[in-house]
């Protein structure tokens, strides 16, 4: 639950209503939020869990980006998907062992992932490249977007989905931007700036590893945030607001 004026704040109530209607009122729906909503949901985000979650988002973004740049051109059908499965299993073991989520460990792992995908035999031929931008649920959920990625790939297109980490940084940035626009506690602005600097360091390492392996790598978030200036206010944040404009310009 984002706590904003978007649908994400209300999904949980719709899910509970649907479960009751389907005859499963005993099934709980836990909320992940940083807005003080659903305090008794039974799910609490701790710092160690947050660090692992951020690492998973970085790894997931990289795997998706590399998979989508290899799959349309692979000589052996399914090779890219098998590589994704291999790394998901490998990273899962590492994270469960309490490793792999520090900045140093991620920066060490990124080039290894990129190298493995670059080793997949491909035949590069011209294809239509389609970028997908949208509200967070519709962009990533096959159910929400009518399985858009599968359809585009069936039309022999290369699909580009901007990563989830961009949305995470967007949410953090907005907390600091609210201080600039409306005032509030300076500590919030300072805290968000420090967190964004840490995320930027890891993100740039991921993008460098991607580019060094011969793949397309978008600009980091700190460059992305500059793109919509003069087109839309950075205070426009409902429905992913200025982020959608920035991603369209980037693509």
Task: Outline where the language-model segments fall.
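An N-terminal assembly and electron-transfer interface module characteristic of large anaerobic redox
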Residues: 1-251
């Amino acid at each position: 639950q984002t706590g904003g004026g978007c649908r994400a704040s209300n999904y949980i109530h719709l899910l509970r209503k649907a479960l009751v209607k389907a005859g499963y009122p005993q099934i709980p729906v836990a909320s992940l939020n940083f807005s003080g909503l659903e305090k008794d949901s039974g799910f609490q985000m701790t710092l160690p869990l947050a660090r692992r979650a951020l690492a998973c988002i970085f790894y997931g973004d990289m795997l998706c980006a590399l998979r989508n740049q290899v799959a349309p051109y692979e000589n052996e059908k399914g090779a890219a998907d098998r590589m994704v499965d291999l790394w998901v299993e490998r990273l899962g073991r590492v994270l469960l062992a309490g490793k792999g989520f520090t900045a140093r460990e991620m920066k060490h792992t990124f080039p290894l992932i990129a190298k493995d995908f670059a080793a997949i035999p491909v035949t590069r031929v011209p294809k239509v490249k389609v970028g997908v931008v949208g509200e967070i649920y519709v962009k990533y959920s096959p159910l929400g977007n009518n399985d858009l990625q599968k359809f585009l790939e069936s039309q022999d297109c290369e699909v580009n989905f901007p990563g989830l980490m961009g949305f995470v940084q967007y949410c953090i940035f907005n907390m600091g931007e609210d201080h600039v626009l409306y005032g509030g506690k300076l500590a919030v602005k300072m805290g968000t700036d420090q967190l964004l600097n840490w995320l930027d360091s890891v993100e740039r390492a991921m993008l460098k590893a991607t580019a060094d392996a011969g793949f397309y790598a978008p600009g980091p978030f700190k460059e992305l945030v500059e793109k919509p200036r003069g087109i839309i206010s950075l205070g426009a944040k409902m429905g992913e607001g200025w982020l959608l404009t920035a991603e369209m310009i980037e693509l």
